[in-house]
UniProtKB/Swiss-Prot annotation:
Record annotation: effect of changing G115A: In allele DRB3*02:14
Consequence of changing Y55F: In allele DRB3*01:09, allele DRB3*02:01, allele DRB3*02:02, allele DRB3*02:03, allele DRB3*02:04, allele DRB3*02:05, allele DRB3*02:06, allele DRB3*02:07, allele DRB3*02:08, allele DRB3*02:09, allele DRB3*02:10, allele DRB3*02:11, allele DRB3*02:12, allele DRB3*02:14, allele DRB3*02:15, allele DRB3*02:16, allele DRB3*02:17, allele DRB3*02:18, allele DRB3*02:19, allele DRB3*02:20, allele DRB3*02:21, allele DRB3*02:22, allele DRB3*02:23, allele DRB3*02:24, allele DRB3*02:25, allele DRB3*03:01, allele DRB3*03:02 and allele DRB3*03:03
Glycosylation sites: N48
Function: A beta chain of antigen-presenting major histocompatibility complex class II (MHCII) molecule. In complex with the alpha chain HLA-DRA, displays antigenic peptides on professional antigen presenting cells (APCs) for recognition by alpha-beta T cell receptor (TCR) on HLA-DRB3-restricted CD4-positive T cells. This guides antigen-specific T-helper effector functions, both antibody-mediated immune response and macrophage activation, to ultimately eliminate the infectious agents and transformed cells. ALLELE DRB3*01:01: Exclusively presents several immunogenic epitopes derived from C.tetani neurotoxin tetX, playing a significant role in immune recognition and long-term protection. Presents viral epitopes derived from HHV-6B U11, TRX2/U56 and U85 antigens to polyfunctional CD4-positive T cells with cytotoxic activity implicated in control of HHV-6B infection.
Record membrane topology: Single-pass type I membrane protein
Organism encoding this protein: Homo sapiens
Protein known as: HLA class II histocompatibility antigen, DR beta 3 chain
Disulfide bonds: C44-C108, C146-C202
Start and end residues of each Ig-like C1-type domain: 126-214
Modification(s) after translation: Ubiquitinated by MARCHF1 and MARCHF8 at Lys-254 leading to sorting into the endosome system and down-regulation of MHC class II.
Length: 266
């Protein structure tokens, strides 16, 4: 550790801590002792539920697989030369092999039954939105984006249609993206040149819905969009005036209700 005397106690302390961290890292970097990473990975592969199950017990050394047990084979097999003596030794132990073969039922099928309700049977509806990647006039090259998010399981089919006809050319996808919360998302984009009056539809099929989800995007010219916005603005303004008029009317009615002609009983 190197300590330099500088004015100001806090600066000296900060510099001292920094130098201590640096010196510890340098000391660690100077340690030339070999380090190894050993990893064991157990896998269950299911086909058509539990109709066919495959169990794998895999062993890795420094991220390289060197040995595995495969229930389809029934014994250990060396993947590299490093695993050959281990495979020969373990294959000679009949009790160990019987135990590993039994993992298909007492490990894989058992855990499938425990987790089936919240894994295999889990269903979450997708959320679908459609929008252009760029805001620009019609008859210019653009990218229409169909965003499908928050769905489970990951099996999904997304299609693009233009005026009712499926578009296959110019369709690109990000593929499945894991959200980290047991849901997925994907973006499926259509390269096209939108023209006024055209209707683009993104159709999504997913196990969580009984019928396909469809979201439309209509190509409108700037003048049509301006007219639509003007119409919406006029409608909202009319509602505001109507609300203000009704408020004034009912307030006046309430004020007059307290004045009654002489002689009437209330």
């Amino acid at each position: 550790m190197v300590c330099l005397k500088l004015p100001g106690g806090s600066s000296l302390a900060a510099l001292t801590v920094t130098l201590m961290v640096l010196s510890s890292r340098l000391a660690f970097a100077g340690d030339t002792r070999p380090r190894f990473l050993e990893l064991r990975k157990s896998e269950c592969h299911f086909f058509n539920g539990t109709e066919r199950v495959r169990y794998l017990d895999r062993y890795f050394h420094n991220q390289e697989e060197f040995l595995r047990f495969d229930s389809d084979v029934g014994e250990y097999r060396a993947v590299t030369e490093l695993g050959r003596p281990v495979a020969e030794s373990w294959n000679s132990q009949k009790d160990l092999l019987e135990q590993k073969r039994g993992r298909v039922d007492n490990y894989c099928r058992h855990n499938y039954g425990v987790g089936e309700s919240f894994t295999v049977q889990r269903r979450v509806h997708p959320q679908v939105t459609v929008y252009p990647a760029k805001t620009q006039p019609l008859q210019h090259h653009n990218l229409l984006v169909c965003s499908v998010s928050g769905f489970y399981p990951g099996s999904i089919e997304v299609r693009w249609f233009r005026n009712g006809q499926e578009e296959k050319a110019g369709v690109v996808s990000t593929g499945l993206i894991q959200n980290g919360d047991w849901t997925f998302q994907t973006l499926v984009m259509l390269e096209t040149v939108p023209r006024s009056g055209e209707v683009y539809t993104c159709q999504v099929e997913h196990p969580s819905v009984t019928s396909a989800l469809t979201v439309e995007w209509r190509a409108r010219s700037e003048s049509a969009q301006s007219k639509m916005l003007s119409g919406v603005g006029g409608f909202v303004l009319g509602l505001l005036f109507l609300g203000a008029g009704l408020f004034i009317y009912f307030r006046n009615q309430k004020g007059h209700s307290g004045l009654q002609p002489t002689g009437f009983l209330s």
